[in-house]
């Protein structure tokens, strides 16, 4: 579905939504000359990013993981700055993303060096064996793990490494935003699970309390700051931060195999299932955002969405359904996903974190329902031009339809995907 959003680039009288030339300064002669050209850089960059995302969670050692991190990150830095409209905002977001991403990569690399100094290997299995044997300086191991987590938590958008998320979500082309929101988060959490469960599973008493604090801060900051947003894409950015906290709550549910009851949902199952449910709702939501436009491009101001339910009830209804899933309303995939991660966290004794997660979910319901209220029960303010809904292409319509179907089916029948997630968990282990 993320690929479908990329493929649908010509939405304004046949003109690409991406900038005509990546290296051109906004408003320059070079940009005006390239304005009508197809932007062929987009597809190679996207394929490089996908290659890195596939390698990232499959890495068996820290060096390969670092290379995959860079392969997926560098194309995203460029793609974030390619919006044809609002070029300055897009390039500002890309620059912030690049600078902060470079720092996080440096932390990850330094953490690799410290872990190698402790274990004498970068292989995740070898690191786990060294921890179990108790060899080396444990202080070096702890600092090294902390620096590795900085690099990965930046990619998933956890507090306090989240500041890039709302800016990039707002400034990047919406197709890129949807791609990043779903695919990058899946790849980054896959790598995080592999690092913690395979390489540092024997040291979980060290990283679980730290992740617990980060999860609490991430959920509260994401939910509270989303309440005051007036831009739809920026609101979804802070919503993504809150969902990162919910996913980290599931990671806290890691337990030894012997501690699990028969048939109990594992932490891996819960997190992978939540990632699937979140991806359906997120890709569907951003697909809808690409359709709501005005003469200057995408209309993402919340006041412009007033009365959208009257002008285009199907599009507004689909967006409302995705928001209800993100809120965790029963009979949606989001409810099943939150139930899974909260259950495994409770079984591992992380009930204080679960209480904060429930509180954050209640706060999040406010801004989701507020958006629905604006679309269906509000009129456009006097002097404000209402946003129109462009005619969706086959690819965009298919993306929204598949997202709606997936969100509904996973909310009603979550069992098959949970079983599939259990099998996928064997790969991560």
Regions found by a protein language model. Give the residues of each.
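Alpha-helical transmembrane segments of multi-pass membrane proteins predominantly involved
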Residues: 1-429
């Amino acid at each position: 579905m993320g690929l479908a959003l990329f493929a649908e680039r010509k939405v304004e009288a046949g003109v690409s939504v991406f900038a005509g030339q990546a290296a051109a300064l906004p408003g320059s002669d070079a940009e005006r000359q390239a304005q009508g050209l197809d932007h062929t850089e987009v597809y190679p960059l996207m394929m490089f990013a996908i290659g890195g995302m596939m390698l990232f969670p499959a890495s068996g050692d820290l060096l390969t993981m670092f290379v995959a991190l860079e392969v997926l990150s560098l194309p995203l830095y460029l793609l974030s700055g390619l919006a044809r409209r609002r070029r300055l905002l897009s390039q500002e977001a890309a620059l912030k993303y690049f600078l902060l991403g470079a720092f996080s990569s440096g932390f990850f690399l330094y953490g690799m060096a410290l872990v190698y100094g402790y274990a004498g290997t970068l292989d995740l299995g070898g690191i786990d064996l060294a921890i179990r044997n108790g060899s080396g300086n444990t202080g070096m191991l702890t600092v090294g793990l902390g620096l590795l987590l900085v690099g990965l938590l930046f990619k998933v958008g956890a507090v306090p490494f989240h500041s890039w998320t709302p800016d990039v979500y707002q400034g990047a082309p919406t197709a890129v935003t949807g791609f990043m929101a779903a695919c990058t988060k899946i790849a980054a959490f896959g790598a995080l699970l592999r690092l913690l469960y395979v390489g540092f599973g024997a040291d979980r008493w060290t990283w679980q309390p730290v992740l617990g604090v980060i999860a609490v801060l991430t959920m509260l900051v994401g939910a509270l700051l989303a309440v005051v947003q007036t831009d739809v894409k920026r609101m979804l950015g802070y919503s993504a931060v809150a969902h990162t906290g919910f996913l980290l709550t599931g990671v806290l549910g890691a337990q030894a195999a012997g501690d699990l009851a028969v048939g109990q949902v594992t932490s891996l199952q819960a997190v992978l299932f939540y990632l699937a449910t979140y991806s359906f709702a997120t890709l569907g939501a951003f697909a809808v955002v690409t359709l709501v436009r005005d003469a200057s491009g995408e209309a993402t101001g919340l006041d412009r969405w007033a009365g959208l339910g009257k002008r285009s009830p199907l599009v507004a209804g689909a967006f409302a359904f995705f928001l209800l899933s993100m809120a965790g309303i029963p009979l949606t995939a989001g409810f099943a996903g939150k139930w899974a991660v909260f259950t495994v966290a409770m079984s591992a004794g992380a009930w204080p974190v679960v209480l904060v997660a429930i509180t954050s979910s209640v706060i999040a319901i406010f801004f989701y329902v507020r958006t629905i209220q604006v679309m269906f029960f509000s009129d456009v303010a006097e002097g404000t031009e209402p946003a129109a809904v462009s005619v969706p292409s086959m690819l965009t319509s298919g993306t929204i339809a598949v997202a709606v179907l997936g969100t509904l089916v996973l909310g009603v029948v979550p069992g098959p995907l949970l079983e599939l997630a259990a099998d996928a968990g064997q790969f991560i282990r």
